[in-house]
Amino acid sequence: KSLYKPTISSMEGSKKGNNKFLLHNNLSEKGFPVFDTILASSLNDIPACIATLRNKGYKKAVVKSQIGASGIGITSLPTVPDGPISIPEHFFFEGPCMVQGWLDETVKNVRHMGSPSIQMFLDERTLSLYDITEQILNKDCVHEGNLSPPLYFSKNDWVFKELFRQATASGSWLHEQGYRGTASVDFLVVEHCGNIEVRVCEINARITGATYPSIIARHFLPHDAWLMRNIRFAKPLKDRSLLKILDQAG
């Protein structure tokens, strides 16, 4: 407002587009594979949700607020609690939370394959899917970078086609909410009982850590690979010091 410049997306479009619960419902209604999900209207509902997921064979569960980003509004819990369950009150600000089964090697016959993400841009008339990346995550699933392309499938594989099929559906839904701009769809790919399964985790209707490196790489190296890592220094560095280190390293 201070610059007297209009935004390309409405506030309502941004809010709806970042709502994980609305996206989950849309994908489920259209028959796409989704995570086992139970709604919790308050903290008192969480133990019963956790118990249900434990009976389904899950060792961990994740509690998601309807809107959140970069680790805000999401927390994981063991399905066998070792103490009282504590969830911040703001998790319920937008309405019921989603309590979902956590798919990884702790679940019988499941092997984690990867966490790909498809980058997209939405304008008034079109949805453009312009890159596919692999998220680099630490042991707590915190984002530490991206690489492209992912190493465990190629363009001719079923996984590649399924990722774009689900990304197209998710992006079309996002467009219907009125969102315009850059976005990405995050996925989980697992092997379950010998079959590969692809599920949408969430849509990030915003600029993400992969947006700029992806756009730059696709502009200058449209058919090549790229890698971006987030680095945190033990002591803060000034920009000149950082550039000097990079110059010295060649």
Annotated model-derived regions:
Residues 93-94, 101-106, 142-197, 234-250:
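A long amphipathic alpha-helix within ATP-dependent nucleotide-binding catalytic cores
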Residues 79-81, 121-127, 190-194:
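Short acidic-glycine loop/turn motifs at beta-strand connectors
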Residues 212-224:
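A short alpha/beta connector and helix-capping loop motif
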Residues 1-48, 52:
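Conserved N-proximal alpha/beta basic substrate-recognition cap immediately N-terminal to
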Residues 34-37, 60-86, 140-154:
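Glycine-rich phosphate-binding loop of ATP-grasp-fold ATP-dependent ligases
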Residues 111-154:
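Membrane-embedded hairpin module used as a gating/binding unit in multi-pass transport
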Residues 33-35, 56-62, 78-111, 173:
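Conserved ATP-binding module of the ATP-grasp superfamily
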Residues 137-138, 200-214:
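Glycine-rich phosphate/pyrophosphate-binding beta-alpha loops
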